[in-house]
Each structure stands twice: as C-alpha cells, then as structure tokens.
Regions:
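C-terminal catalytic domain of Rieske-type non-heme iron oxygenases
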Residues: 42-203
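Rieske [2Fe-2S] iron-sulfur-binding domain
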Residues: 1-62
Length: 203
C-alpha cells in the first residue's frame, strides 16, 4: 500500500482533498508466517536477514509467538543462557517423535537426538537432564555474541552447542543435527515483549 487516499466521501462534490492527503505507509514482507515492517527511511532499509528459518520452505518451519510480561532484555538473556534448559525445560523421561502423536509441531525438543553412540541413545532431553553444569564460554562477533557450551558426557563424547546472539533481539540455537530454533524478542514497552520462535527442520 502506498498510503494514497482514494476517496473522501464526506467532502463536497469536486473536492480534491483526497489527492492531497497521504497516510504514512511502511513496506511489509511476510516470512515463515510472520509479517516484518521497515519503519525507517525507505532508502535505508537493510537487506532482510538470511536466517535459516526464512530461507527454508514453509513445510520445514514452524513459527509461533507469545506475549511475555517482562522487558525484552530479560527475555533475551534467559533465552541465550545455555544452562537454563537443564532446569526450565527438564523432562523426566524421553520420547521419540513417533510417540508424540500425529501433530509434532512445537514438540520437537522432546524428540531431537544426538543419535546412537557407544550403544546408547542420547536424546536432547537426556543430555539436558543429566549434564546440568556445562562449561560456557563467550566470544564477541560482528553480529553480537557467540556462546559455546560444552557438556562432557563420557570420556569419548562431549556435547557441543554453539549459540549465536544476533543483536539486538535475535538468537539462533542448534537443537540437534537437523533442527534449529531462531528466537526474536520485540519490545512492546518497558514491561512487555513479543516473543517469536521459529523451529526449522533440515530433515
């Protein structure tokens, strides 16, 4: 939409007001079921981010949102904390995808697996539950922050997770060899935040 007024029916016949009135408009595009608008100068719009969740076909992305009653920075901080999953997302048992049912959307966390190593299955739920004191390191990157998390599981096996914090509001988490989560935290005001989450499957 260009913002051009098409009609002013309450104006007298012959009025040219509608030709002079314009509503401010902003370009909007849709990606993975979410609308994105650029509110800055039209000639200064940056390239749209080439994240996996926007490049993958819609059949491989599940997106949802929620309204959180907290500041966006609080939401961002808890999401990039690699230790919180061992406590706030702890499952006492593990479930393969086949056991979740016919609609697995949003439940992939429970079925994500590192595979079979040394005759043992290592679903992510087990990794998070049994190894809750990881070694965490941080490195500055041009886009923000890289967080490397190491969970030593056996003398031969270490779980490595690299999270990218893309400032000011996005981070990408690799959940398994075939699944990533991209989260965005959009401030509404000082105490409310819209949280957008994109599960992208490469399977």
């Amino acid at each position: 939409a260009s913002g051009r007024c098409l009609d002013t029916p309450a104006e007298p016949v012959g009025s040219k007001l509608c030709e002079r009135v314009r509503q401010t408009s902003y370009p909007v595009i849709e990606r993975s079921g979410v609308l994105f608008g650029w509110f800055g100068a039209p000639d200064k719009a940056p390239p749209f981010p080439a994240f996996d969740c926007f490049a993958a076909p819609s059949t491989h992305v599940f997106a949802f949102k929620g309204l959180w009653h907290c500041n966006w920075l609080q939401a961002f901080e808890v999401g990039i904390d690699p230790a919180h999953t061992s406590f706030l997302h702890r499952f006492l048992n593990d479930a393969p995808l086949a056991a979740i049912g016919i609609n697995p959307a949003g439940k992939q966390f429970r079925s994500a697996s590192l595979g079979d190593f040394g005759g043992e299955q290592w679903p992510m739920t087990r990794v998070m539950r049994e190894f809750h004191q990881p070694d965490i390191s941080f490195e500055a990157r041009p886009w923000g922050l890289q967080i490397t998390t190491l969970r030593s599981m056996t003398p031969e096996l270490t779980h490595v997770r690299v999270t990218h914090g893309i400032f000011p509001q996005t981070f990408v988490i690799p959940l398994s060899p075939t699944l990533t989560i991209t989260q965005m935290h959009v401030p509404v005001d000082d105490t409310h935040t819209y949280w957008f989450s994109f599960f992208t499957s490469f399977a």
